[in-house]
Amino acid sequence: MTYSKIACSLGKRGIARAPNQASSFFLLLFLFAKFSQQLSPSPCLASSGVAKSRGPASTDRPCSASMAEAVLDLLADCSPTASVPVAANAPSCAGVAASAGAQGASPSSQVSPQA
């Protein structure tokens, strides 16, 4: 099981949900990665699956990327505010509201007057 899978599953189960617990959890994870890097100077992330889980952009990385980078990637993956790619042709919220108003589907036109 990779570091990202372990940390994400712990975060989803509520072990690392509270702010203080989450920061201490990731600090311990970072320190563990730092010390394991000192014990083994070039860990191969490709064999553990950490680099593969990030998609095609991560395959450009060399196999000897540091564990600290893996932890930082893990933090980016597991954060609730991680950016989600949006399709370039997806309509914006303002555009959808404007088109709904132009078609007479605005909330004010749908309200029937009370007698």
Curated annotation (Swiss-Prot):
Stretch forming the signal peptide: 1-38
Superkingdom of source: Eukaryota
Region described as Disordered: 42-62
Description of what induces expression: Expression is strongly induced under conditions of nitrogen starvation. Expression is positively regulated by the cluster-specific transcription factor rua1 that recognizes and binds to the specific 5'-T/G-G/T-C-G-C-A-T-A/T-C/T-C/T-G/A-3' upstream activating sequence found in all promoters of the UA biosynthesis genes.
Alphabetical UniProt keywords: Signal
Name of this protein: Ustilagic acid biosynthesis cluster protein orf3
Primary role: Part of the gene cluster that mediates the biosynthesis of the glycolipid biosurfactant ustilagic acid (UA). UA is a secreted cellobiose glycolipid that is toxic for many microorganisms and confers biocontrol activity to U.maydis. UA consists of 15,16-dihydroxypalmitic or 2,15,16-trihydroxypalmitic acid, which is O-glycosidically linked to cellobiose at its terminal hydroxyl group. In addition, the cellobiose moiety is acetylated and acylated with a short-chain hydroxy fatty acid.
Pathway: Secondary metabolite biosynthesis
